[in-house]
Amino acid sequence: AIHDQGLRIDGRRTNAGDDGGQRIPAAIHDQGLRIDDRRTTAGDGEHATLTAIHDQGLRIDDRLHLVGGQTGEAGGGASGSAHPICAALAEHGAMTTDELRKLVPDLTLMMLDELEQLGMIRVAEPDGASGGPKTDLLLCRTDATPDHRPGERQRLIIDFLEQHGESSWDELRELYGLQRGQVRALERAGWLTTREVPVWRDPFRGQRVEPRAEDPALTDEQAAAVGEILRAHGTPAQRPWLLHGVTGSGKTEVYVRLIRHVRALGRRALILLPEIALTPQFTGVMRAALGEEIAVMHSGLTPAERRDQWLQIRRGSIGVVIGARSALFAPIDDLGLIVVDEEHDPSFKQNEGVRYHARDAAVMLAAATGATVVLGSATPSLESLNNARRGRYGLARLARRVQGRPMPTIELVDLRDQPPARGDREQPDTPISVLLEQAVRQTVDAGEQVILFLNRRGYAPAMACGDCGESLQCTACEVSLTYHHRGRVMRCHYCGFSAPVPRTCPTCGSDELTSTGAGTERIEEHVVQTFADLRVGRLDRDSARGQGLQQTLQAFRRHELDVLVGTQMVTKGHDFPNVTLVGVLDGDQSLRFPDFRGGERTYQLLTQVAGRAGRGDRPGHVIIQTWKPEHHVLRAVRDGDFDGFAEAELRLRSRQGYPPFGFAALVRLNSADQVALTQAGAQLRELLTRPTSPRVHVLGPTDAPIPRVRERYRTQILLRSSERTPLHQAAALVTAFAESLRATDVRVSTDIDAQSML
């Protein structure tokens, strides 16, 4: 929505340059986020708002106290919406934020923050809470020479302070066994003064980064991109920028130079990344280039670390904030630059609770704060590309890799002609072709590394009976159970159900159960069995739990692994200079999805994973195994022809009226009662197709691609329109319809600009 004509926030549409636009950052920061382009049934938004408040540093069990007997008259500029808070506290006394929310349903962090700063309320943590910053006691030698004669150990402390200056009590306690009582005695005697300072928890877990010795020289393309963006910064010509750079072209260095510029102007920067897996490497590069004034915000932090980061950002001691999509709501004043790296990535879309697209919200936030927003990608979304072509966005291109490194060569291997490599007795055929297996051997023998990509975790996607042909199904979802070799367990990747592998077929009693297909576990096992001398690692959601993610990435980066098998977690943004071979085991996988974005997703995914090869001194090679080597998307990937692919895809979208040439909303309905769901779907279609209803094209209702999840049946209706307004009007009808179903089990939600049809 923001990509196009502006996003409706707090019930009003706002465009860049709107005089009232300065209210938007507050609305975004408090994450009350009343976005018209998000329709949910009661409860979804409520839960999301509470979660957002908790994530931003306000605990739901914090106690709120009214200060000085205020009666609810919010003076000093407090907004009128804050009055009910003071009134509730005056009537009911101190209460937790969760209790207050029940009395003031629209409670947001911004309201409480405003009242706290005005001194009208006081926020106190519950007993035993450890969310605030730790403190350290600093000791400093005074200029006085008191009459008090210090003892031997006290003399050591005084001498140390005279020699080293202000020092930590923790340090002196470790060196000399200094006790608090001795500190108080010296302070009373006048030998020293003390002060407490906050000690922030380290989100980098002690990982040290060496500062850059010198900056790399910019290529002509990088220098031109930096110059173009900075010339427009802070002028009437300022607009969002699309930085379209091939993999390895140095987009990160462009970000560094832009950040330095806005920091020199006294403003701050926000960088959004699609995956927390990218954060450690990316922050390492930024810390080396920019210093330590960097905060990170993502779900991988502990609650205490997240709170410390939030408090430092709020106090203004942090110049650069890096994080996943939720970092968009960090309390950053004086915002000068927003970078959305890998802007095409679908994980920037929040699909639960308050639905929003972080890229689009970043564009709106930049317009409201006067910041420059840069959207970076090697494979831009067609929406962003279309905006650049129409002049709404500026376009800066990096067409070549840095240091003259060549792009990797890409080879399409036709699986119809290429025999599979030898497998084991249970599964004689493997998804690895003989050609790819030979390439792995040659690459490792040359002292180089390999990435094998398969976007399917587990050992096998199904287990079937050799006699009756039935596969093991989830009892709560209409999907096959995935076989996980570790623990010999069948697991549903949608609801989390798991069960041991049965000894016999539940349908016919046969003991001829065999796993079919392959996931990353099986590929890892096959490589280990085939190449006993190779060091093999795996990176997927199962192996990445806890510290597994960073341990695997660090081991691969240090060349403690020869081959890394992984899902799409290995495709995004990683820089492994010694990787020269990438093997894609199933190049057709995302083409099979029932989604009009299937071709775009395939091009992006394959180009991104191919970009991991040849980023160092040696050229890279990519082998993509496919059953459809003639497919135009795969040919475009092979040829590195983004422009040709985009042109063909945009022509197709234009003929069909799909985004970016039209607008779409996906209405999802679900219920445990299939009959009630069918009736609700028919009623909603009838409502939307009445002559008096907004003029939108209604497709459905139809079963969702996965018709049942968590014991709830699912159906969906696709709404399409050439204009935003009718779509918003139709969404309002859906919301009213959902309200009428409150007493039933049918749940309804509307996803504007849905990124997935699943």
For the regions a language model picked out, list residue spans one by one.
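Inter-lobe coupling/hinge segments of SF2-like helicase ATPases
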Residues: 213-227, 236-678, 686-690, 694-696, ...
